[in-house]
C-alpha cells in the first residue's frame, strides 16, 4: 500500500516507545503533521478523505490544531466549505480564543490527523456545541482504534477514518519493513489496546 510505504519511508510512522497525548505508551507513532511535506501522497490522502465524507451533510469544517489543520484546509478548499480551527488550550495572548470560527447554527465536520481515545475530539465537540454549532461527523486520517469511535458516539458524532491502524499494522507485520522484535512489540500492543 503506497500510503503505508510512504509513512515508513518518510519516517512518518516511527517505531520505538512513544508517549501519546492520551498518556499511553505506544510502540509506534504516526507523525502525520509532516505528511503535507510529501504532496503526492498528501493530495491522494485528501482525495480519499473527501471520498469518505462526500455524503455527509455539513456546512463548515473545523480543523483541530495542529495536526488537523492542513487536512481541513485542503478539504475546505477542494469542497468549497468555510474553515475554522480549534486549539486544545488557550494560547494566553491576543484574543485568547480556543475556537477560531463562528460556528453558531452550523453543521460542523471536525477534522484531525489521528484519533486514539477520542479525548481531543470529544473536547472539541463540547466546545463547538457550547458555541452553538453542531458537530455532525469527525474525520481523521488514521483511527488508532483505541476508543475514539465509542467516545464520539456518546456525543452522537460519527467517526470517519481514511485508514484504520489495524490495516496499517497488519501490512507492516507481513512485510520486511520492520524487525521481528518490533513486530512482536506491536502485536503485544494490539492485543492489549485495539478494540
From Swiss-Prot:
This is Orotate phosphoribosyltransferase. Pathway: Pyrimidine metabolism; UMP biosynthesis via de novo pathway; UMP from orotate: step 1/2. It comes from Sulfurisphaera tokodaii (strain DSM 16993 / JCM 10545 / NBRC 100140 / 7). It is an enzyme of class 2 (transferase). Its EC number is 2.4.2.10. Orotate binds at residues 116, 144. The keyword Glycosyltransferase applies. Its cofactor is Mg(2+). The keyword Glycosyltransferase applies.
Amino acid at each position: 500500500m503506497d500510503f503505508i510505504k510512504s509513512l515508513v519511508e518518510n519516517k512518518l510512522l516511527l517505531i520505538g516507545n512513544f508517549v501519546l497525548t492520551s498518556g499511553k505508551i505506544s510502540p509506534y507513532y504516526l507523525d502525520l503533521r509532516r505528511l503535507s511535506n510529501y504532496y503526492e501522497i498528501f493530495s491522494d490522502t485528501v482525495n480519499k478523505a473527501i471520498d469518505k465524507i462526500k455524503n455527509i451533510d455539513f456546512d463548515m469544517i473545523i480543523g483541530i490544531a495542529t495536526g488537523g489543520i492542513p487536512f481541513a484546509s485542503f478539504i475546505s478548499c477542494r469542497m468549497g466549505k468555510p474553515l475554522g480551527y480549534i486549539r486544545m488550550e488557550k494560547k494566553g495572548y491576543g484574543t485568547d480564543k480556543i475556537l477560531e470560527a463562528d460556528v453558531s447554527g452550523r453543521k460542523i465536520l471536525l477534522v484531525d490527523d489521528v484519533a486514539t481515545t477520542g479525548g481531543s475530539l470529544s473536547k472539541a465537540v463540547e466546545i463547538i456545541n457550547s458555541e452553538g454549532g453542531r458537530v455532525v461527523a469527525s474525520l481523521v486520517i488514521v483511527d488508532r482504534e483505541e476508543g475514539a469511535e465509542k467516545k464520539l458516539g456518546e456525543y452522537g458524532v460519527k467517526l470517519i477514518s481514511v485508514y484504520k491502524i489495524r490495516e496499517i499494522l497488519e501490512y507492516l507485520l507481513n512485510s520486511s519493513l520492520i524487525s521481528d522484535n518490533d513486530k512482536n512489540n506491536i502485536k503485544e500492543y494490539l492485543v492489549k489496546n485495539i478494540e
